[in-house]
Regions:
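Short cysteine-rich loop/turn motifs with clustered Cys
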Residues: 1-19, 44
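Short, solvent-exposed coil/turn linker segments
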Residues: 12-14, 25, 79
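Amphipathic alpha-helical interface surfaces
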Residues: 16-19, 37-38, 68
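Histidine-centered catalytic micro-motifs
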Residues: 18-26, 43-49
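A near-ubiquitous, low-amplitude feature marking generic local secondary-structure context
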Residues: 21-25, 55, 66
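Short linker/helix segments within small regulatory modules
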Residues: 24-39
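Short Cys/His-centered divalent metal-binding micro-motifs
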Residues: 38-64
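Short flanking/linker segments adjacent to small metal-binding domains or redox-active Cys/His motifs
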Residues: 63-92
């Protein structure tokens, strides 16, 4: 049984299949993978095309990056400066 849910809306992906989103993309995509900074999102609604999707809504993207930074700092025992060294800037 698959218990995955969209990080943003909580749906199970039955109507809109879930996609894996790397919180820090581009040059930091591999580091997102390495540190587990990925979330499942409804592919159309929450990931790519909805008005509140992370690729169309700056507030959603900022919220996810803040969440990702706090998760990384907590799990890795990092300071804000440590995070900055790994990911180039702080999102707090």
């Amino acid at each position: 049984m698959d218990n995955r849910r969209c990080f943003l809306c909580g749906r199970n992906g039955a109507q809109d299949p879930l996609e894996r989103h790397h919180i820090f993309g581009g040059a930091y995509r591999n580091k997102s993978e390495k540190y587990g900074l990925v979330v499942d999102l409804c592919g159309d609604r929450c990931h790519r095309n909805g008005s509140l999707s992370v690729h169309r809504n700056g507030n959603q993207m900022r919220m996810l990056r803040r969440h990702g930074q706090l998760k990384a700092m907590r799990e890795q025992g990092w300071t804000e400066d440590d995070f900055r060294q790994e990911f180039g800037k702080s999102y707090l």
